[in-house]
A protein has these predicted regions:
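Charge-lined substrate channels and their catalytic hotspots, especially those that engage the 3′ end
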Residues: 1-326, 333-379, 417, 714-716, ...
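Electropositive polyanion-binding surfaces
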Residues: 230, 257-260, 264, 271-705, ...
Length: 753
């Protein structure tokens, strides 16, 4: 055998590769692809591997995959046969066959039904395909995923022979459209190459990165990698690093990685910033033309202590049994013109995003914290919903007007709460002149809440999480953050304004964007009613579909039960996600016939959009200038884009919280806590701690019995002992693991003495 001068060097390099901790057993063609070898070099690789196997330094399994020898030497003849089996087909036909998806020539339509959908990956290698209009996803076994990756649009063949009660199985025939042109992950370097391991566990394949495409990334760096070759069933995808975000341990890199992974725009283009800089930082005299002057009306803002983008203010008086409520909203549309660079960027973002260590605003801070923010003592342009409300909480008359206001006090929730609960003498003295208005607000808020309750509005009152970070961005505490009397006042007044505006524009049949919420999924409701029945709670539906009032009845019937919070969450999960539409189809959760988002134009694009419509109507432009047709053309896309951006922001915010909770718990490994079982599944028990952190007790750590999941009763039951774990049950747990990368917390059960 004729050898090149570098044969021994290459043999040494291959041994280092096989021994690398990151290396996973590969076939000959996979190794050749990984090393980007040409035809002649591939032949030498064959010889190198052959000799290493003969020397007992490497071994090959029955699938032709090579690894460093692990104490058991293989027969050389078997190795050679496996190597021969791995030799690629020669010529055009062989090349074409290799390039085709392996399933395209193994299956035909007679074997099943062709469908198209979105591939949802799983970290274990298998996946699911979501098919529009089909309730249950199609399961795709690991060996049948082809080159499909998470979020790809794929064509699949759903196999015949589906048994009732079991999930349908399919095989990926073809990738129609790639869903993820790039990924965010952690770079792991080796000698002459590296891999990017995706932060998204649904993206199960590591991306091979050659040294020349690494952008100088170091081991452990968070990076963005563009996928240049999606690989195949037997070959890893390849890519190039396009951005190095920083080392994993650097402050803020972890959250920045989440921002990048969700493709959330975080840097404003220069053109947008220049346009924002041209906006005056004070109200111009010309801006007041045609506006109702309410600067002498006593108004306050009530927000969180740290809030800087104050987009709503309140005024309230009472006369002859009638409440005169003013909800005054920042007139952002006066400064952000439709179709401008500012507007296009705002639509692209859709919403402000609130992450654990940062806010990514929809608008540049010069606007959101400046001229658009209703800052104390400064003239500000607003759109006001002025409502007369009777003592039953009914709006008996209203007016929507272009206004100018001057806020008298910038209040925070804590001060208003303490004043109303008589716990802060300093605050009471400081805001003495406003105290009667605050108590009037509390009075009206209670009336409005009671009225909504009577019509069937559903109130899920869960504590949110407040994550405390230190200067380095590390989580040092996690606390529950619950609603209070002050937050409820603002919520009730904003809901009323949103309903009032929506009703006027829906009954007037104007083009508009509504906030709609469909009825829950009937199957999920049936499962919930079965669970409640097992808990001794029987709810009878009045018709085919459940009503908001019946959901409210469920929540009232479980009040005071040990598992109240957990069943409330399960009830919430039966709900569909609210969205933006141009059809006024009602809001199930609020039991409202009319609803929109009018009150937050600084941080939500639909609010900004409907402000423009209101302006055009008030100034007669809808008909006179043909604006009605313009809005009919654009609003469907505005609603769709806004819904997509909202879901993206919600998911990013959840991931941010999960990451920081896992980080916090990683500093408390081995510590014990009291918790409540918040979820029961076939793979274990979810337990929620008083600080809102949730973790999993894996079923394989429950070693005292063999536990079986009863889906109808929502419990784990010991096969031998009969021991039961149920929703809402108190347990004591020890923190076993907290994985910041996977954003998970693992507990083990602390057995009772």
């Amino acid at each position: 055998m004729k050898r090149s001068k570098n044969f021994e060097k290459r043999k040494k390099f291959i041994m280092e590769l096989l021994g690398d901790p990151l290396y996973k057993p590969m076939r000959l063609r996979e190794i050749a692809s990984l090393l980007q070898l040409d035809k002649s070099e591939k032949k030498e690789l064959f010889d190198v591997l052959d000799e290493l196997c003969a020397q007992g330094k490497a071994e090959v399994d029955n699938k032709g995959r090579y690894s460093k020898v692990s104490g058991k030497r293989r027969d050389r003849r078997k190795n050679k046969e496996a190597l021969k089996a791995e030799k690629p087909e020669r010529g055009r036909k062989g090349r074409e066959r290799r390039e085709k998806n392996h399933e395209e020539y193994r299956f035909s339509e007679k074997d099943g039904t062709l469908m198209e959908g979105t591939f949802i990956g799983h970290y274990k290698g298998f996946g699911f395909v979501e098919v529009e209009g089909q309730e249950q996803d199609i399961f795709i076994p690991e060996n049948d995923t082809g080159s499909a990756m998470h979020q790809d649009k794929v064509q699949i063949l759903v196999r015949n022979g589906h048994k009732e009660g079991k999930r349908q199985e399919g095989v990926v025939l073809k990738v129609l459209e790639r869903g993820m042109p790039s990924i965010v992950g952690t770079y792991q370097s080796s000698r002459d190459y590296g891999f990017v391991i995706s932060d998204n566990p649904k993206f199960s394949k590591d991306i091979f990165i050659s040294r020349k495409n690494s952008m100088g990334a170091k081991d452990g760096d968070k990076v963005v990698a563009e996928i240049t070759d999606y690989g195949s069933r037997n070959r890893k995808p390849e890519g190039k690093i396009t951005e190095v975000l920083g080392n994993l341990r650097s402050p803020g890199t972890d959250i920045l990685a989440i921002v990048k992974s969700f493709n959330i725009p975080s840097v404003f283009p220069d053109k947008v910033l220049r346009q924002a800089d041209r906006v005056s930082d004070h109200v111009q005299e010309a801006d007041l033309d045609g506006r109702l002057d309410l600067r002498n009306l006593v108004t306050v803002t009530i927000d969180g202590e740290d809030a800087k983008d104050l987009d709503d203010a309140i005024s309230l008086t009472k006369e002859d049994g009638i409440y005169h409520l003013g909800v005054h909203i920042a007139d952002v549309s006066n400064y952000v013109q439709g179709g401008s660079a500012l507007d296009r960027e705002a639509l692209k973002r859709g919403t402000s995003v609130y992450l654990a260590d940062r806010v990514i605003p929809m608008l540049p801070e010069r606007l959101s914290n400046g001229i658009c923010s209703l800052n104390q003592g400064q003239d500000r342009l607003t759109l006001s919903c002025l409502m007369d409300v009777n003592e039953k909480g009914k709006v008996i008359s209203h007016k929507i007007a272009e206004t100018v206001i001057r806020v008298d006090e910038r209040m925070c929730y804590t001060d208003v709460k303490n004043i109303l609960e008589d716990t802060d003498e300093v605050a009471k003295k400081r805001y003495e002149a406003l105290i009667p208005m605050f108590f009037l607000m509390k009075e009206l808020s209670g009336i409005l809440r009671s009225r909504r309750h009577t019509r069937g509005s559903i109130d899920f009152d869960f504590p949110e999480s407040k994550i405390i970070l230190n200067a380095a961005g590390r989580a040092i505490d996690v606390q529950p953050y619950e609603a209070n009397v002050a937050t409820r006042i603002i919520e009730d007044f904003m809901l009323l304004a949103n309903e009032t505006v929506a009703q006027e524009y829906c009954t007037g049949d104007y083009p508009f964007v509504y906030r709609t919420h469909e009825n829950p999924d009937p199957e999920k409701i049936e499962s919930l009613l079965m669970l409640l029945h097992n808990e001794g709670v029987n709810i009878q539906k009045s018709g085919q579909e459940i009503t908001p009032g019946e959901i409210q009845e469920i929540l009232e019937s479980i009040e005071g039960m040990p598992n109240e919070a957990q069943i409330s969450r399960l009830t919430l999960r039966t709900m569909k996600q609210a969205k933006y539409t141009t059809e006024c189809s009602g809001h199930f959760g609020l039991a409202a016939k009319y609803y929109c988002h009018f009150t937050s134009p600084i941080r939500r694009y639909p609010d900004l959009q409907i402000h423009r419509i209101i302006h055009d109507r008030l100034r007669g432009r809808l008909v006179r200038e043909g604006r009605t047709e313009h809005y009919k053309e654009i609003l469907d896309e505005v609603a769709r884009q806004s819904s997509v951006c909202e879901r993206r922001a919600d998911e990013a915010e959840r991931e941010s919280d999960k990451l920081k909770k896992a980080e916090y718990m990683s500093y408390h490994l081995g510590e014990e806590y009291e918790g409540i079982i918040s979820g029961v599944t076939g793979w274990g028990l979810y337990v929620e701690l008083p600080n809102t952190v949730e973790g999993l007790i894996h079923i394989n750590t429950l070693r005292d019995d063999y536990y079986v999941f009863d889906q109808d009763a929502y419990e784990l039951r010991g096969d031998i002992t009969g021991k039961i774990f149920r929703l809402g049950q108190k347990v004591r747990v020890r923190v076993a693991d907290a994985d910041k990368m996977l954003k998970t917390v693992d507990f083990v059960l602390v057995e009772e003495d």
